Amino acid sequence: MNLRAGVDLGGTKIQAVVVDERFSVLGQERRATPTKGKPADVAAEIAAAVRGAAEIADAEPSELSSIGVGSPGDVDDENGTVTSARNLPNWEGSFPLAGALQDELGPPVSLGNDVNVATMAEATLGAGTPYQSMLGVFWGTGVGGGIVLDGKLWLGRDAAGEIGHMVVKVGGAKCPCGRHGCMEAYAGRGAMEARARELVKKGEQTDLFAIMEKRGRERLTSGIWARALVRQDPMAVRLVERALEALGAGVASAVNLLDVEAVILGGGLGVRLGDPYRKRLEHAMLPHIFADHRPPRVLLAQLGDLGGAIGAALLASQSETARA
């Protein structure tokens, strides 16, 4: 049996899977993304996650035919590097991630943009399979986008799909990218947490950080936001409403430009909050869609939390074919 591993490297979690030739998941492992240290520490956690997934699949890492990694930041698969992964600790410069993992685990390693590989997974194996054009929107630590046109991933000049950095308010809130008014400055989980901390310093009350401490977390994960919403925590409700307003305007603007058939909502928050918030995104988009008599389908990512990792395994398979 030909086995491959795929890794989704996120701001709060590292998700690894081992799949067979049909991309059925035989083993998986999830680990927390380090909040301190250097890129080498993140690479060590990735390697540990792959080992864990391989063990569950009753395989050794050396028996894998290849490994794919979907990473944030500026990904250079040809040189095996990731640069400026701002949602990861101290990852401003370039780090040879592919080489570090290959030295540690053995099989060849391919790198891809995290959102692009997740988008291709949904287009090839998930909710996007009936469509020739779609926009993947991945709502998590940041807000990422992937574009499929005529059945193919569209990369532009290698930076297409950065939907989180579409401006939804001129001169608005500062984004982690350093610019102002980006959708991610309102809807990214990292920015939402930063805003929650600011409000607490000003004296506002919330259960968010009490839930975080009870769960033994250092960050406000998607699960913590979901629990706070169940409790109808006023701050959580207000910040999620603010995020949905920004998402609705930004995603609708992208739809006006591309006229895609479908929007696929994924990412940690998108998947965790689920169908009720898919419907709310759809509602938030409608006032901004020009062709509102035929809006695109808005669908929840079918592959769920594993979509990014499965997409990375799909990338590894494509790289094997290219090398053959």
What are the functions of these language-model segments?
Residues M1-S66, D76-T81, G99-V109, A121-Y131, ...:
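ATP-binding/phosphotransfer module of carbohydrate and carboxylate kinases, centering on a glycine-rich
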Residues D8, G68-P72, G112, G136-G142, ...:
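Short beta-strand segments
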Residues K13, V115-V117, T141-G144, V170:
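Conserved A3 ("GATE") glycine/threonine-rich loop of ANL adenylate-forming enzymes
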Residues E29-R31, R86, R157:
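Short hydrophobic alpha-helix segments
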Residues A32-T35, N90-W91, A160-I163:
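A short acidic/small-residue loop/turn micro-motif
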Residues G80-S94:
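A charged helix-plus-loop insertion that forms the helical arch/lid used to bind
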Residues N87-N90, S110-N116, G136-W139, L299-L306:
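Active-site nucleophile and cofactor-binding loops and adjacent substrate-binding regions
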